[in-house]
UniProtKB/Swiss-Prot annotation:
Glycans are attached at residues 125, 300, 312, 328. Pfam families: Peptidase_S10 (PF00450). Its EC number is 3.4.16.-. This is Serine carboxypeptidase ctsa-1.1.
Length: 469
């Protein structure tokens, strides 16, 4: 306990320190960047990495960014997606990102919840849930403005991806509720391939698979005839049982274990069999928690619906085995655990190794919300603009879920589905509602800012400036 208290004290001293010399940079940064910690509760401490805008940091918007999991690091966004520097394959150097979002805004990347990345619990207890995570993220946001008061009145945006589809709306709603006590110039929130509705994600995944030629026609016809009374479009596949559940299980098993890349249907999986991405495990545990338990479901198929089985298994503590090594994160792991890098970003020597995702966080995380509808409605009602963007080749959190979710919110539609363009080419499609924009990113998977960087830079720039896409 004495060591833990000393560690907490040491971290408090390092809060907000500027990064003076980041190892491996192949360019001279024209912006300030910081790495530090926020004590967000009696026992939880969150690590953050803050990059000021390259443009006008005294005036430009401020973005708080959260990756998902639950249990995966937001530094994936920094070093793989939209940060000013991107990790090279050698795991030692960083190259400049031409489409870094800090060319138009200052960005704060928060590793959340405690136990993720370099965030930790002073007593070792990292048990958390959706409400506690949003509360501690809110505390981190408030502490940021205390640490950097010059940004207090900047236009502020809360953004994230994947299970950030829960983190971001719950945090944004909490900021809305706290405006009287702690005013923030909150202008908008944005989600990338956000996990916004559990049942919709299951239903639309099957339809997505059929629409992309992944399901045998005979199986599809059987599913429609025997399980959906001839109308599969309105069929609730989460409630099917018996042989119908078996059909749906077989489809999901192929999507996750059939050799395809769930993050991007048309992107190859990493060919190195020794690479077993932790992000795959956490996606399986987070947004498709039963994918590793088909045999057990088959034995109990007459006793439970698919949805109930998914829900039960999402609360299971059993370890998962991920057999699809689609994403290679070794360069980030090597870089973030480099002793010189740790020293440069002020990581205490007695903190453990950094990892892209935390098994312990994911297996102990308690999911409370399966539908973000009430949160999004509250946010829009309070005049906070919402952007939902989806790469249209992602199978983990597919665009059809986001599209149906947006349409079912009950907001007035102001523009029907219409192409939007970048560089005179169709970059995706947009549907506009009062206070909310739903857009797709053509040819992008789960990490759209990484795989369609120019298009995403433009889309986010337009959103920040409140300009039409």
């Amino acid at each position: 306990m004495k060591t833990l208290l000393l560690l907490a004290f040491f971290v408090g001293v390092t809060c907000g320190e500027e990064i003076k010399d980041l190892p491996g940079l192949d360019f001279e940064p024209n912006f300030k960047h910081y790495s530090g910690f926020f004590q967000v509760s009696d026992n939880h401490v969150l690590h953050y990495w803050f990059v000021e805008s390259q443009n006008e940091p005294s005036n430009d918007p401020l973005i708080f960014w959260f990756n998902g999991g639950p249990g995966c690091s937001s530094l994936d966004g920094l070093l793989n997606e939209m940060g000013p520097y991107v990790a090279n394959e050698d795991g030692k150097t960083l190259r400049e990102n031409e489409y870094s979002w800090n060319k138009m805004a200052s960005v704060v990347y928060i590793e959340s919840p405690a136990g993720v990345g370099y965030s930790y619990a002073t007593d070792g207890n990292i048990t958390t849930n959706d409400d506690l995570t949003s509360l501690e993220n809110y505390e981190a946001v408030k502490q940021f403005f205390t640490e950097f008061p010059q940004f207090r009145h900047h236009q502020t945006f809360i953004m994230g991806e994947s299970y950030g589809g829960v983190y971001v709306p719950t945090l944004t709603a909490r900021i809305v509720d706290g405006q009287k006590d702690f005013p923030i110039n909150l202008k908008g929130m944005a989600l990338g391939n956000g996990y916004v509705n559990e049942k919709l994600n299951i239903d639309t995944s099957v339809r997505f698979a059929y629409g992309h030629g992944l399901i045998d026609e005979k199986i599809w016809n059987t599913l429609e005839r025997d399980c959906c009374r001839g109308c599969i479009d309105s069929c609730d596949l989460t409630q099917v049982t018996g042989h119908c559940a078996t059909l749906v299980e077989d489809i999901f098993q192929f999507l996750w274990f059939g050799g395809l890349n769930p993050y991007d249907l048309y992107r190859d999986c990493d060919p190195n069999p020794s690479v077993n991405s932790k992000r795959m495990k956490h996606m399986l545990r987070g947004v498709a928690p039963a994918m590793a338990h088909f045999d057990e479901l088959l034995k109990n198929q007459t006793k439970t619906s698919l949805y109930q089985f998914l829900k039960n298994k999402s609360q299971s503590q059993k370890p998962l085995k991920a057999d699809v090594p689609c994403l290679n994160d070794t360069e980030m792991l090597s870089y973030m655990n480099n002793p010189k890098v740790r020293k440069a970003i002020h990581i205490p020597f007695n903190l453990g190794k950094w990892d892209i995702c935390s098994d312990k966080v994911t297996t102990t995380y308690q999911k409370q919300y399966t539908d973000m509808t009430p949160f999004i409605k509250k946010i829009v009602k309070n005049h906070v603009r919402v952007l939902l963007y989806y790469g249209d080749t992602d199978m983990a959190c597919n665009f059809m879920m986001g599209q149906q979710f947006s349409d079912q919110l009950g907001l007035r539609r102001t523009l029907k589905k219409t192409p939007w363009k970048y560089d005179r080419q169709i970059a995706g499609f947009k549907t506009l509602f009062d206070g909310l924009s739903f857009i797709t990113i053509r040819g992008a998977g789960h990490m759209a800012p990484q795989w369609r960087a120019p298009q995403m830079y433009y889309a986010v720039q337009q959103f920040l400036n409140n300009h039409p896409l």
